[in-house]
Every structure is written in C-alpha cells, then in structure tokens.
C-alpha cells in the first residue's frame, strides 16, 4: 500500500525481443537425399533419389535460377504437390516459418499516496508478446490491475482491502491444430518447394491455412478480493479477521476456415 504524504506516480516501459532456441539444425537437400537413399537401400535395396536428381539438387544449391524446381510436374493439379522425392529445392522449413525474432513490450504505471489515516496504492500493467512464426498472427496479451487501501478508522480499528484482476488473452491462427502443424513441419523434405507451379504457396507449405482467417482465442481472467479487519480492544491484544475471495473465468472460441489452394480441376 501507499505511504502517508504526497502522491507519487511511477511509469515504466520495457521493450525486448524473443528468439527461438534449440530449433533443429536441418541438413540441405543433397545431404538429405544421400541419407534417405542409404536408409531405403538398407531396408529395401532401392534408392528414391537417382544420381541425376542428386546432381540437380546440387545444381540448385549452387545456383537456384539454373534449374527448374518442378522437373516432374507438367500442370498445377492438386496431386502434383506432395512430400516426396519429386521436386528440386533446398527448403529449410524451420527457417521458412520462424522469424529471427519477435517483439515483446511491457508497460506498468502506479499511483500511491494518502494521509495519516488512509493510504492507497493503484497499479496497472500491460504485457504484449508477438509470436515467432513468420506467417501466423500469434499474440499473447496480459492485463493486470491492482487497488490496495489501508485505513485507520479509529484508535483501535484498522481495515485493509485489496482488489486484483488479471486477464490473459491468447490468439493463434492454428485453431487447435498446433500439434499437427509442428508435427508436419519436422517431416517435410528439403527437396520440396513451398511454391506451386505459378509461385503461389502450395498446401505442403501450410501457409494457406495460416492465412485463411482461422483463429483460436482463449481468455483467462482472475479476480481476487482481500479484506481484513484489525481490532485492538486492549493494549498488546489484537484481533484479526481476514476474508479472501477468488474467482476465475475462462472462455475460448475457435473459427476454422479452409485455406486457399490454387490449382486446376
């Protein structure tokens, strides 16, 4: 709570950045093809990537403009795009989807003051953190509010009260499919391009779903009320009575919309 005397106002703000840690260190498409060939040859006696395909992958790494990234594709049909040995690219799927950093901001303001009989303290805060995914509008916000008042009503009666409220809001376009998104992200082959025949994001990139307008929202609120009474009927004899009340509420909503995948029927 505040102290007797003149009012004081304090304001603080902090801005920082978050960055992903311990992301997988992905191999390039040539290394992947050689590893995959070794695995399939040991298991089945066959190789999925021919020497010609591996040479094309190396050529793409050396000069991406010197080779077609769709040598097996002749049209933009839906079935042309799959997570297979088809395609010539060098896609790091984690680099594609993760930004190098995301911004976070924290603001707090408080007011305190009072007199010999009553002291008060009021504070409020806002915390905002953006998500690390490049093509997904993910945000986390937290709001908090606090009021505390202590009052000496008489020489032997003192009351105190405190109200705290916190609201947490989380928004994501993954709309309940977070596990599937990250599961698929780690399984995509680097020789597969995120683009279709005409330069649009293909389904394997998962970006059409992130930009479809789908949205999952959750809100968590907590209200805490604290009250206390202190009575001193006799010298060196104090009686305390405290009341605590806590209430939490949660609500969530999910909107799932189809992604726009370009192609021909």
Predicted features and spans:
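A generic beta-sheet turn/junction motif
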Residues: 4, 113-117, 126
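Surface-exposed loop/interface segments of Gram-negative outer-membrane beta-barrel transport/assembly proteins
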Residues: 4-89, 127, 131-224, 240-242, ...
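Outer-membrane beta-barrel initiation region
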Residues: 100-101, 111-114
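Periplasmic N-terminal accessory/gating domains of Gram-negative outer-membrane beta-barrel systems
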Residues: 1, 16-17, 95-97, 102
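Outer-membrane beta-barrel channels and translocator barrels
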Residues: 104, 115-116, 152-156, 232-234
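A beta-strand signature from Gram-negative outer-membrane beta-barrel systems
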Residues: 1-10, 104-106, 119
